[in-house]
Design a protein with these regions (language model features):
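Extracytoplasmic gate region of multi-pass secondary transporters
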Residues: 1-48
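Small-residue-rich segments within alpha-helical transmembrane domains of MFS-like 12-TM solute carriers
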Residues: 9, 13, 94-102
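Helix-to-loop junctions at the C-terminal end of transmembrane segments
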Residues: 47-60
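Structural signature of the two symmetry-related core transmembrane helices
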Residues: 63-77
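Helix-loop junctions at membrane interfaces in 12-TM secondary transporters
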Residues: 80-90
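Intracellular juxtamembrane helix-capping segments at the cytosolic ends
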Residues: 99-113
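A late C-terminal transmembrane helix in Major Facilitator Superfamily
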Residues: 112-151, 157
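Multi-pass alpha-helical transporter architecture, strongest
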Residues: 155-165
Length: 165
């Protein structure tokens, strides 16, 4: 759970923090990059409406967790390989990342046998997970500055999402 939440937050922080710069590097205008960035934030809210409708019907949530994690992986890679489709990749990433966050927090409650255990699991998963996530944007920014483009940071996010799956 800790790794699942941490990787999701790391990838989300990298994309939310660097998406406008990524889009500008691919020829988008500042207005276009800002609009796509806004779509990302809206797309992360949609799973809050959709995921609960599906979750209560599933006995095993691993399949949906893997699917939404792979949405993050494919969309991060897509931003590099097919930047002309950035709106689609952003919407897919937003949905996947939002759903992953909901699932990660839900897993804590599902795995705990008591309120005390849920609080302990939540504290550990979120504190370690967010500590990991906080390293993402500066690290990927440094990699970008060293490499000169966003290929390695985006592919690193895609690979991290595969690990999360």
């Amino acid at each position: 759970m800790t790794l699942f939440l941490g990787i999701n937050s790391l990838i989300y922080y990298v994309i939310i923090g660097w998406l406008p710069a990524i889009l500008l590097s691919h020829g988008y205008s500042e207005a276009q990059a800002g609009s796509v960035h806004g779509l990302l934030q809206l797309a992360t809210a949609v799973p809050g409406l959709a995921v609960p409708l599906v979750l209560h019907r599933l006995k095993d949530q691993r399949g949906i967790a893997g699917a939404v994690a792979l949405m993050c992986a494919v969309s991060a890679a897509g931003l590099w390989f097919m930047p002309d489709m950035a709106v689609m990749w952003t919407l897919v990433f937003g949905f996947g990342s939002g759903a992953t966050m909901i699932l990660g927090l839900t897993f804590i409650g599902l795995r705990a046998s008591s309120a005390h255990q849920a609080a302990a699991l939540s504290g550990m998963a979120q504190s370690i997970g967010y500590l990991l996530a906080a390293c993402g944007p500066p690290l990927m920014g440094k990699i970008h500055d060293t490499a000169g483009d966003w290929r390695i940071p985006l592919l690193a996010c895609a690979l991290a999402a595969v690990v999360m799956a």
